[in-house]
């Protein structure tokens, strides 16, 4: 496994995302299979696990918590996210955070993100009336969050405005980064902007949920002409 240093941590370059998990014929999460995947990942050096409130119809955190509970707490780093992008009623960060800790069966999160700060929810995240960011900054002070960051699919003006206001509080940012989104979602410009704020970048969707590993044959043939030994997935890996 390849590792990268983040502050005083040694993180696996490959993380274990749980937005998509194996399911049974009736659509439930196949927990035995998921457990085997988690065990295999840890045994082979993966130590970063990413979940979120909304993943797998709000069940990902619960299943991930059960799977990781079987391993020593200091053998993995766990990240989850506050669902500001899906709120349909008044925000209650304290209640949501308490539920997340219960579902994940932990007393702290190694990494905690504001989920998808973008044009449609940035006002919720930043409104002093709700105090969302202030609440999580306080949880970090109390040790219940070790590192606070955010994920985003925002356009550049929105991202710029958010960083101007809260960049000092954000320790890392997760963006969609692959050779397609380098231009499609302006990942290049987002990387440049985040670098100006000295904010480390986390990569999500490096192969776009597998789509960049399963290209049409015509596209695969073109890539094969340039690098016969390379798979479609390896192109995504080397350009992300």
Please name every model-derived segment.
Residues 74-86, 112-115, 175:
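A short, structured active-site edge motif that brings together acidic residues
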Residues 101-124:
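Active-site groove signature of glycoside hydrolases
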Residues 20-32, 81-92, 120-125, 154, ...:
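Active-site mouth loops of central-metabolism enzymes
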Residues 6-10, 42-43, 65-75, 98-107, ...:
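Acidic (Asp/Glu)-rich catalytic clusters
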Residues 28-41, 89-105, 154-165, 232-237:
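Short, acidic/polar
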Residues 1-76, 135, 141:
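N-terminal binding-site loop/beta-alpha segment at the start of enzyme catalytic domains
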Residues 117-240:
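Beta/alpha (TIM)-barrel catalytic core signal, keyed to glycine-rich beta->alpha loops juxtaposed to Asp/Glu
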Residues 14-16, 41, 49, 64, ...:
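Conserved, mostly hydrophobic/aromatic
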